[in-house]
Regions:
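C-terminal peripheral helix-coil segments that are non-catalytic and often amphipathic
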Residues: 1-11, 99, 103, 144, ...
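Basic, helix-initiating cap at the start of DNA-binding domains
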Residues: 1-37, 41-53, 60-61, 66-67
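Hydrophobic/aromatic residues within well-ordered alpha-helical segments
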Residues: 22, 65, 72, 76, ...
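Short, structured helix-loop boundary elements
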Residues: 23-24, 44, 66, 70, ...
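Conserved hydrophobic residue
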Residues: 39-40, 130, 159
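Amphipathic alpha-helical linker/stalk segments
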Residues: 70-101, 106-108, 112, 146, ...
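Amphipathic alpha-helical packing segments from all-alpha helical-bundle domains
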Residues: 95, 106, 111, 115, ...
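Membrane-interface starts of transmembrane alpha-helices
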Residues: 160, 164-168
Length: 230
């Protein structure tokens, strides 16, 4: 059904799809297969069949299955504007962090992302490379974008000097709360918007208690000095 829909869309555009359209079709096919069968269970032949292109075309765009997997994750991050150049930078600290955290929670609560977390966790023990790829291409890439924002706020004197990598992981964990765990376990299908907004607001406020410049007597002598994974 999915393949037929893609072929119909290509026919409506007339003639053979262009290179970018083929790359997009390959990404969509790979995403569907990775979610259904995992990285280890998905072959490039299957991706080619699902996308309605030749295997040679798949390899022409993505040199390996690992490269294709990374591209799928990267495309999801970019969909939510979660790359360094896509994050807002001209707001005050609270407004900026609220905007960043809203995007972060929209990303990690996206059904496809939740499903991919489950796939990776299920395969991590038997195929640890899959977990490494996901961690590097997803959480670490997202962390890098947020670290740049936190570094800018610190350079502007709006946050105390800190290790931005460590602080980014802290901010993510404050955002997760118990919402993401419930999603992963299938205890909830979606998060009510008001609950999501409340969680984001609390996370930002708690983060600013730790890091906002000009807060007296809050015991920050050691805050942010531990080194986080890069």
């Amino acid at each position: 059904m999915v393949k037929q829909a893609r072929e119909a869309q290509a026919a409506q555009r007339g003639g053979r799809p262009k290179s970018e359209e083929k790359a997009r079709a390959i990404l969509e096919a790979a995403k569907d297969l990775f979610l259904a069968q995992g990285l280890h269970g998905t072959s490039m032949d299957a991706v080619a069949r699902e996308a309605g292109v030749s295997k040679q075309t798949v390899y022409g765009h993505y040199e390996s299955k690992e490269t294709l997997f990374r591209a799928c994750i990267r495309s999801k991050i970019e969909e939510f504007g979660f790359q360094e150049e896509g994050l807002p930078g001209s707001l005050g600290p609270r407004a900026l962090l609220l905007a960043v955290c809203r995007r972060f929670m929209a990303l990690v609560c996206d059904p496809d992302v939740v499903a991919m977390y489950r796939v990776v966790i299920a395969e991590a023990v038997s195929h640890p490379r899959i977990a490494e790829l996901f961690f590097e291409s997803g959480p670490v890439a997202t962390k890098s974008a947020v670290s740049a924002v936190l570094g800018e706020l610190s350079a502007r004197g709006e946050l105390r000097p800190h290790d931005p990598d460590y602080a980014s992981w802290q901010l993510f964990n404050l955002c997760f709360g118990h919402i993401h765990t419930r999603l992963l376990f299938g205890l909830i299908r979606e998060v009510p918007p008001e609950e999501l907004e409340q969680q984001v607001g609390r996370a930002v406020d708690d983060f600013l208690v730790l890091y906002e410049a000009g807060r007296p007597g809050d015991g920050t002598a050691g805050v942010g000095r531990s080194k986080a994974p890069k």
